[in-house]
Amino acid sequence: MIRTSVFAAVALAFVSAAAPAQQRLQVIVDPRIELVSAVEILTEQFGNLVSSSDTDYRRDLLSRFLPFKDHPAVARMAQLAGNGFNYDAPMQTMVCLSPPPELEWKAKPEECSAERAGGADSLRAWAGQLRDFARKSDFAAFFLAHSDLYARMVEGARSKAPHDYAADLEDYYGERQASYTVVLAPLLAKGNYGVRVKRADASLDIYGIISSVNVSDGVAQFGGEQNLRYMVWHEFSHSFVNPEFDRMPGAVERSGKLMGPIQKQMASQAYPDWKIAVNEHMVRAVTSRLAFRILGDAAGQATLERERARGFAYVEALAGKLKEYEQNRQRYPTFHDFAPQLVAVLDGLAALNLPPEFYETPFTGTIESAQRESGPTVLIVPTAETDGAAQRDLVVYVKRVQAQVLKDSEMLTDQEALVRDLSKCRIFAYGTLAGNLWLARYKDLIPAVPVFAQMKEAGPLRLIAAMPNPQNSRRGVTAYTATQAAAVIGIHGLFHGPTAYVIGKENTVLKTGDYRQENGKWALR
């Protein structure tokens, strides 16, 4: 009875009178994912894969479940995580189970990440412990108590996802799946997952599990329309793409030498082997083509450049081959029919002995491309802020960022940076456009500055923007600035990455945009 009322409160379909097909696409907060997320937090083994945002919801969760920190389900989860049961694996397992507290198997454990949990018996044992955890902690009551909060999250996401993404995918891949569910995961961060459960008729219930990107007014946020569209296309695509290449492991392995030059970039994104990297390349090639077809050439090219900047060196060749698929659908009615042609592209690349220049990823105008560059990392802090106390606190904040995520970086004052050769460096600059003297000198290289200056909202406002390195235009810089020095403190909580700039108030995104190159210079798109 509790489970029924909970799902009635939070499982809301995308409904449009003009497009009934959208009713197939659901958005929910799923008690199974919230349960496993809570256990992940209690293990303290999942690092930045779980959200550390100090919200009422997270405080409620810790208050409720910390007394169960020593439960066998938590201890066993910590062990499993250390052996590879992490990232998407727990999510795949959870969608194979019924809602808590019953957690009954709906699929064979062998199809639910058992191999990453030490085998089917090991996974069954942990699921039994998790069932006991859910009952003893009365997780269902906790979930029901927060149903209003979940409904607010769902409504917020619905307002930013007006399109029938399921139709986009079915049209492109040439096949239909049983169901499509967007799962909002407010306790997760830094990762999104595409998982699936096979029905008796071989069709799939597919899930796109979307992590929170920031918090606004105490409610987890999941990005704007552009971010949600990309994530849904990407995560749902795994359920179409992965089975195709998983069924031909020998053919995929033939081109395994291509992993060597991109090993570091792939491993840093939790794609440690060629099989996984191939699936990721294929998905990103398809989402790039979807952007070209549905959003236009500019959006498609920007998407392709973003994937290339993320280290997916072969995505352009694969996306180019997909044009042949699109133009010959009578010969290739489904993606399944065309998949061997994509494997052949990788075989061809492997035979070429590609030079080092092929793998260079020049600055493409996005924050993400600036931050994924190799080379020494430099953090530039201000010395000329008018608010001295805020300047001191900002330096402390940047030192904290350095200790947590940029441990090998060097911190420079703006004055030191102005006399250094930083042409080979990855740069993060902090402070106001006047108080950081390095930013003050080079602010005209930031195309987003005029947009920031024209914002009408009451401040303080934040701007995170990419810009070219003034000493080497093939490299990028990330500027973390604001209308007041104090507002730069905590700025990493504002979601940023896939676009050229983000303007926000606290952690709420107000405006984003991209750049284009014009006569060798970057300008607003």
Residue ranges and their predicted role:
Residues 14-18:
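N-terminal signal peptide c-region/cleavage motif recognized by signal peptidases
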Residues 22-160, 198:
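Non-catalytic architectural context of zinc metalloproteases
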Residues 147-206, 407-418, 422-432:
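Auxiliary, metal-adjacent structural segments of Zn-dependent hydrolase domains
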Residues 242-269:
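Post-HEXXH active-site segment of zinc metalloproteases
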Residues 116, 151-159, 218-223, 227, ...:
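Second-shell loop/turn segments in exported
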Residues 109-113, 194-226:
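Active-site scaffold of zinc-dependent metalloenzymes
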Residues 226-246:
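Active-site recognition of the HExxH zinc-binding catalytic motif
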Residues 23-52, 96-115, 294, 298-525:
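Solvent-exposed alpha-helical segments and adjacent loops
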